[in-house]
Amino acid sequence: KSGETYQIKICTKYRLKSAIDPLDFFCRLSKTNLAPEAFMIRDKDYSIISCSPENLITKKGSLITTKPIAGTVRKNKRMNKIKALSYFRNNLKETKEHNMIVDMERSDMSRICKVGTVKLSKEKAVEEYKDLFHYVSLIKGKIKKNIKNIDIIKAMMPGGSVIGCPKISTLNLLNNQEKENRNIY
């Protein structure tokens, strides 16, 4: 129906069976994909490997931060950091998408943070990675008393940059469109 979502990010799950040791694969991936956020979960029957520049949740004491990424441009000889910033700021689609994701993440944080503490500490900056420039913001807040880690995860997940906006109606649309639930994704 018209008007149910502003943006939807559909994905496809891939599975592979391989003789490659998951830990070896993770180590190789970490060397070639220099993403600051990476993890590996190894179970008896499966492994989950993730490498991403995006940080959905960081908690230190009563402080929580999130760093949404909405905007990516490939590095090349003509695209440096200053040109990337100009590209993002002058591209209406990139700016609107970034604002939408930042607003959604601030709203999610407001459910678990003390009133008036959710603030943008870095707004619309360009971060440089090996092959890409990303358009990022950093949001901080102070967690309310009696909020448990599971409450934080429930409030913040899934992140807006991987599903779209608004969160609840977009999740409902995704559940009807995608062949499998995203689970760990």
Which residues fall in each region the model found?
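Extended alpha-helical targeting/anchoring segments
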Residues: 1-185
